[in-house]
UniProtKB/Swiss-Prot annotation:
InterPro entries: AcrB_DN_DC_subdom, Acrflvin-R, Multidrug-R_MdtC. SUPFAM superfamilies: Multidrug efflux transporter AcrB pore domain, PN1, PN2, PC1 and PC2 subdomains (SSF82693), Multidrug efflux transporter AcrB TolC docking domain, DN and DC subdomains (SSF82714), Multidrug efflux transporter AcrB transmembrane domain (SSF82866). It comes from Salmonella paratyphi C (strain RKS4594). GO terms for cellular component: plasma membrane. The lineage of its organism: Bacteria, Pseudomonadati, Pseudomonadota, Gammaproteobacteria, Enterobacterales. It is found in: Cell inner membrane. This is Multidrug resistance protein MdtC. The keyword Transmembrane applies.
Amino acid sequence: MRFFALFIYRPVATILIAAAITLCGILGFRLLPVAPLPQVDFPVIMVSASLPGASPETMASSVATPLERSLGRIAGVNEMTSSSSLGSTRIILEFNFDRDINGAARDVQAAINAAQSLLPGGMPSRPTYRKANPSDAPIMILTLTSESWSQGKLYDFASTQLAQTIAQIDGVGDVDVGGSSLPAVRVGLNPQALFNQGVSLDEVREAIDSANVRRPQGAIEDSVHRWQIQTNDELKTAAEYQPLIIHYNNGAAVRLGDVASVTDSVQDVRNAGMTNAKPAILLMIRKLPEANIIQTVDGIRAKLPELRAMIPAAIDLQIAQDRSPTIRASLQEVEETLAISVALVIMVVFLFLRSGRATLIPAVAVPVSLIGTFAAMYLCGFSLNNLSLMALTIATGFVVDDAIVVLENIARHLEAGMKPLQAALQGTREVGFTVISMSLSLVAVFLPLLLMGGLPGRLLREFAVTLSVAIGISLVVSLTLTPMMCGWMLKSSKPRTQPRKRGVGRLLVALQQGYGTSLKWVLNHTRLVGVVFLGTVALNIWLYIAIPKTFFPEQDTGVLMGGIQADQSISFQAMRGKLQDFMKIIRDDPAVNNVTGFTGGSRVNSGMMFITLKPRGERKETAQQIIDRLRVKLAKEPGARLFLMAVQDIRVGGRQANASYQYTLLSDSLAALREWEPKIRKALSALPQLADVNFDQQDNGAEMNLIYDRDTMSRLGIDVQAANSLLNNAFGQRQISTIYQPMNQYKVVMEVDPRYSQDISALEKMFVINRDGKAIPLSYFAQWRPANAPLSVNHQGLSAASTIAFNLPTGTSLSQATEAINRTMTQLGVPPTVRGSFSGTAQVFQQTMNSQLILIVAAIATVYIVLGILYESYVHPLTILSTLPSAGVGALLALELFNAPFSLIALIGIMLLIGIVKKNAIMMVDFALEAQRSGGLTPAQAIFQACLLRFRPIMMTTLAALFGALPLVLSGGDGSELRQPLGITIVGGLVMSQLLTLYTTPVVYLFFDRLRLRFSRKNSKPVVEI
């Protein structure tokens, strides 16, 4: 009582406290970073190693395995996967959430150093690592095009100058340059000319390497001067290499230009990049795992004028893709939704109270509570994101509830003729405990969320804390500022025997009278209500089992990502044509704004595309509808498939896959994996619950298998090393020397001229110089036959792995897809030697499914404990919690009605309903208990009077919460996929709960009261006179 009086009778102090909360909130709001979602990126590090010309199996056994054994000892590694292809190996390390990325990087470098002695010789460089997730979509893509510059020269400028500058920007984790490769001097050998001159390929290689050296020459000095010695020991251009003498034939010099074409070209000619219809160099920028995407993009954009200033006039630099506009638009939509929710809630209050002065009080209390929350968010290191702003939107209904309960009770005393300050003090005292109970029990709902681990826990933590802080501030405001404003702003009125009967007042009176009549009937037919209550409990269980489930709603971020998978024996020239064909199909779609793509590198039969859609206001279709439309057109392209998926703000795992979800097959036997993977793939491809089924196990590439006759080789004086060196020199794009320039280092690349290696007959032209100096054709000691070979070898941990990726057809949920996969694996009878498990987002979904019921039960148990402590009763909390089944039924039915699967966002809605709907029961139970204690009423009389007396505040608080959530349901535009499931769940639960709990709660109250009396009679002891 004295606590409330302190603030009611000291208005200046109360106003200044509220002003201080508001000012701190405004300052926090200005300092808060902006993001699409809370920070939930796993720390990921990618290790890369190369050995040009090495087969995928060689890379896996000699490079990947030693590195994996060393890297696998690092603490905190969640998952280690590797992919080895022609000449390259890439290992992805995903760490625990609590692992510091910089500390993990130091451990990775130490592990690489430890494995260095086990790696093969001939590697052009040591393995390197990058602190970025290669499976993440780039946050920004820049393109370089030019009418006069070659692709190699553009690539050199991009990688040497632009990429280095961009990588220094805060938040940038990796700048991947694609579309070509570094400039190089390429030596294309003529096998017939070499044979005629009697020159071996090794001799050419050694001559070039010896002619291009960079060694210190020292200095000469006398007593006065010092001269630095400089020689022309380096050859830097193709023109300088052409006259190089590589051999003498009968005293005549054989020059390099006589037996080879020497050109200024690029290191790897099997690379191509495009933007729309033009050749381009792509700079794909990814952020650090812990970086903020908006701040990073803003930093890049701020650097663009400087970058453009350093670019020659012949180069055009453009932004091909930027993830930030849709994020900003989504947050703007949430902010508008928040403003609409506040306005609707204030309107509800005005309609019920029909007083401008009375409405002004919650109109002040709500902004103070919401704005003050920003200060706490800043102190906690949170951001302004979709979830935290949705928490504030939902909090609008909660924070006004506290003010409504206090305000309505004070208004009731004023209508009875009590003086304002006395009414404020008396009214606050009566409902103070009720408001505290409602707020504490609501905050208790979120305690299990704060203890939840993994990605879901990280994702929901900001939502839970933000909402809890807003409720806490609202509690303080409703018990301090609200009664003070009521005491000083509202006026008492003469007691009336009847309330006004105009407009909404007449409707409320009619509703209250109708409710009273129906409640009397219900209290006389409690068994029927009991059956209805038990029916809702059973219906809850059935609906939860039956409803389709997913991890997170599919977002429309305005960006699509596509992976091209062509025939495994396709050539680079044909693959480049496929890229152009696919880009034309997509570019012609009316919803597409920009298309970029590239192909080549170590995987000739694959490519990547990034598609920017037009803003939501300029297109009618969602991203998924556009994918469905394009899928039909793309399927007509022969020899290759393009798999499209909408880029999501959450992508789990480090695997690069051509679809959103993955199912991984593991085995310690590569033979068993290769036997069962095609069978499983065929069975899964036939499932209607899956779309775009594809795989990364590519073991049908074309291979030419050479079989040496070792006896013949020994007789001819040829060893295996010389034969292998011949093949590497001829067909491996072998980097044989380095050209040092001020800005970068470039390579001399040697191979047989492509004109002489267009078919298998090229092998017949190859020869080896034996120990006697004679040229021995390869066909003398080797036979060759075509065979199948893997284009890549994949590992997870140290086991052979194959990942099957899939998307979901429209109308299919992730739960339906995972159930179909598990059922199919059981039907196939896959042996124990081949293990299957979901990975990435599908794996997190499985883990979340297992913990959802536990989380809901934990929330209910926590609320029960808090209510039990507050009421000092085991029974009354059960009465209050009896409101939950009806809310659950309403929420699940609403999701079914809107064809929305049960996701993590819907789970948040269920948790919120646990806190919202029990408020009705708290208000009823509080007044019923008070009526029994002070009024001497029977339980039936007390609960009946409490229901009628609290009908108006119950309607006000329910409608306030409902109207606070309604804008989430009706919202469109960017980010609506996240907001709508939350609004649907809350609105559906509130409507059903309001219809049923007004009747079930009084019946449950009386049931437990009778049960308590029976229990007390059985345990009562007879009085014994002594």
